[in-house]
């Protein structure tokens, strides 16, 4: 890595720290190794072991994991002390392709804000990206066009609005056969091949192959209010609506958003779920997969 790249990275890390420390967040530095992780079936992890000195047999080796996120250590700190916190952490995820977007080892910024919800965090993240763009603007490796994009307010679309705009139908009104029909209409294969697919599988297919590629590239885009049919540990909201045919229905969403810049997902945020039974049930379901 050349000196310009090292200076650019150092400036980014320092600007990130300045942003959150200046707003009263406590910086954490948690371990990279953990004896247990939060169950997430979508992630492959790195496993290793600690070899105890002067021990033999079953007691000699202690299984450990490289953390895919510092969340497992951050949340106990929040629960114990009630502080807004952030961390710039090395994270490790197995089975990742290696390229300019993905890597098995990468640096993640994770922050938690007390007395705030997911919409508050949109503004915080918007301010953060604008601050970062300004902080590195004069460096040789800074991309002026990307800096101009990051300096703009987010375009905010609910997931239902995004499907209406880019796929031509209301996600809120669509059942599983409807999603299969729309996938066929949009050139994603024949309906027959989706006979065994669930609603969330078809939703993911349409999101990845139809919605995400059409998101504007000249402004950061925040997709929010994800369908509750897609499990995640976020607060749930319910809204009574009237369909085009006059029937009323309840549209359930999760207080979640993701931000895309030039088609790449940069950030993911929840209003954290607080129901202990829901959280324990989710952990059990994930661990069973």
Across the structure, where does each feature detected by a protein language model lie?
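Flexible loop/turn segments at secondary-structure boundaries
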Residues: 34-39, 94-96, 229-233, 241-242, ...
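Metal-assisted phosphate- and nucleotidyl-transfer catalytic regions
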Residues: 131-266, 285-289
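Short conserved micro-motifs at the rims of enzyme active sites and ligand-binding pockets
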Residues: 77-78, 100, 234-236, 270-272
């Amino acid at each position: 890595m050349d000196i310009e790249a090292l200076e650019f990275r150092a400036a980014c890390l320092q600007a990130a720290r300045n942003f959150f420390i200046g707003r009263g967040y406590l910086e954490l530095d948690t371990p990279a190794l953990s004896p247990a992780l939060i169950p997430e079936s979508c992630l492959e992890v790195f496993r290793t072991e600690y070899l105890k000195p002067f021990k033999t047999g079953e007691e000699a080796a202690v299984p450990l994991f490289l953390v895919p996120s510092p969340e497992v250590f951050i949340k106990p700190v929040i629960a114990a002390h009630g502080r807004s916190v952030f961390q710039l952490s090395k994270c490790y995820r197995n089975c990742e392709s290696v390229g300019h977007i993905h890597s098995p080892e990468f640096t993640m910024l994770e922050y938690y804000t007390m007395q705030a919800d997911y919409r508050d965090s949109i503004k915080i993240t918007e301010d953060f990206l604008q601050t970062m763009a300004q902080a590195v603007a004069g460096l040789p490796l800074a991309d002026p066009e990307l800096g101009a994009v990051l300096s703009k307010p987010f375009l905010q679309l609910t997931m239902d609005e995004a499907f209406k705009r880019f796929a031509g139908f209301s996600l809120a009104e669509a059942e599983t056969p409807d999603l299969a029909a729309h996938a066929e209409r949009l050139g994603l294969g024949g309906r027959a091949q989706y006979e065994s697919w669930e609603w969330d599988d078809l939703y993911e297919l349409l999101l990845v192959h139809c919605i995400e590629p059409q998101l504007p590239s000249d402004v950061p885009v925040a997709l929010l209010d994800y369908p509750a049919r897609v499990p995640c540990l976020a607060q749930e909201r319910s809204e009574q609506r009237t369909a085009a045919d006059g029937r009323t229905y309840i549209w359930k969403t999760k207080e979640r958003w993701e931000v895309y810049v030039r088609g790449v997902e940069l950030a993911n945020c929840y209003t954290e779920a607080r129901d202990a039974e829901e959280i324990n049930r989710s952990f059990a379901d994930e661990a069973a997969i």
